[in-house]
A protein has these predicted regions:
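Compact, glycine/acidic-enriched structural inserts
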Residues: 154-165, 169
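Short active-site-adjacent structural elements
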Residues: 125-128, 153-154
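A surface-exposed partner-binding patch
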Residues: 1-122
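Short, flexible loop/turn elements at secondary-structure junctions
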Residues: 119-121, 134, 147-150
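Low-complexity, glycine/alanine/valine/leucine- and proline-rich hydrophobic stretches
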Residues: 128-136
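Short aromatic-glycine-(Arg/Gly/Cys) micro-motifs in beta-strand/loop hairpins
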Residues: 139-147
Length: 171
């Protein structure tokens, strides 16, 4: 069986500042909460995402940039994230929170391709999603950037969530 994030050092991964604790970080999700959230969202969350959220449920990483081959409205060669949504409902920036995945689809018009997992510094004008279009609701989704300012242009960032986390770089 594959070990999630084998060899990856999370020692200095998270920036547990006041804002992160207030808006993003929740207690580790129970299996029951995970099942409830998956049912509400209509998608099976990737094992690597669940594993990471059981270690640290949401938050702001120190490394917030992911390189891209094509320019975005944010930069010529990368996207930036503000934080990673945790599994839950109680924090505004959690999967089923006040500003969670369904809110971004319903209120901001993001395409229904999967689950919003990261917000970006643009305050809603671009987001990071788990993209289930190719794999279906129970498969292993890709991680994509969706740019609202460019007619919801979708750019693939990583083949899976673990590769996305491993690819984050310092600004």
């Amino acid at each position: 069986m594959k070990q999630e994030f084998e060899g990856f050092d999370f020692t200095n991964f998270w920036d547990d500042n006041y804002y992160a604790r207030k808006e993003y970080i929740s207690d580790a999700p129970t299996d029951e909460l995970i099942a409830d959230v998956e049912k509400e969202l209509g998608y099976k969350l990737p094992a690597s995402y669940i594993w990471l959220m059981k270690q640290h449920n949401g938050g702001i990483p120190f490394n917030t940039c992911f390189p891209t081959d094509s320019p975005t409205n944010w930069a010529e060669d990368h996207i930036a994230i503000t934080g990673i949504y945790g599994i839950g409902r109680e924090k505004d920036y959690s999967l089923c929170g006040e500003i969670g995945s369904q809110f971004m689809i319903d209120e901001w018009g993001y395409p229904e391709i999967g689950v919003a997992i990261c917000d970006c510094p643009s305050a809603g004008h671009d987001m990071i999603f788990l993209d289930y279009r190719e794999c279906g609701p129970f498969g292993e989704p890709k991680v994509v950037h969706i740019d609202q300012e460019s007619d919801f242009k979708i750019t693939t960032l990583a083949e899976n969530f673990e590769d996305f986390i491993r690819g984050l770089e310092n600004a």
